[in-house]
């Protein structure tokens, strides 16, 4: 998604976007995130990029090193989503445990959905997503 798209959609609801890390390299951002002692866990992966084994992993240096070369270390292209549970801005860490992992295939019955998951020739194709439950500890 482009910055213009975001600005236009925010304007529709009377908001103005501020983008302090726009165009900062993801490799730099993830190293800063890890160095600052933030804790984050992967709660969803796009199966076109990452398999079930990545769901439930803590984002740390080992996680970043294990990513395929074409996966953004911050998940900026939709490769994965995460939940931040600890860090210097948290009053206290969120206690949780990783629960069940489930796979949800995409249902391409609506033209609007199908058009968003049909990549350019040669690009990876998303068939579904892996999720994990994050349960109170």
Predicted features along the sequence, with ranges:
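Nucleotide-activated chemistry modules centered on ATP-dependent adenylation/adenylyltransferase
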Residues: 1-137
């Amino acid at each position: 998604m482009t910055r213009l798209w975001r600005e236009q959609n925010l304007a529709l609801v009377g908001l103005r976007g501020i983008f302090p890390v726009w165009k900062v390299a993801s490799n730099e951002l993830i190293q800063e995130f890890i160095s600052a002692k933030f804790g984050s866990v992967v709660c969803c992966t796009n199966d076109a990029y990452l398999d079930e084994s990545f769901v439930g992993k803590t984002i740390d240096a080992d996680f970043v090193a294990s990513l395929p070369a074409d996966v953004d270390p911050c998940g900026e292209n939709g490769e994965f989503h995460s939940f931040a549970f600890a860090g210097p801005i948290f009053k206290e860490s969120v206690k949780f445990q990783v629960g069940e992992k489930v796979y949800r295939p995409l249902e391409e019955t609506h033209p609007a959905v199908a058009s968003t998951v049909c990549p350019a020739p040669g690009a990876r194709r998303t068939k579904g997503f892996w999720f994990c439950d994050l349960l109170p500890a």
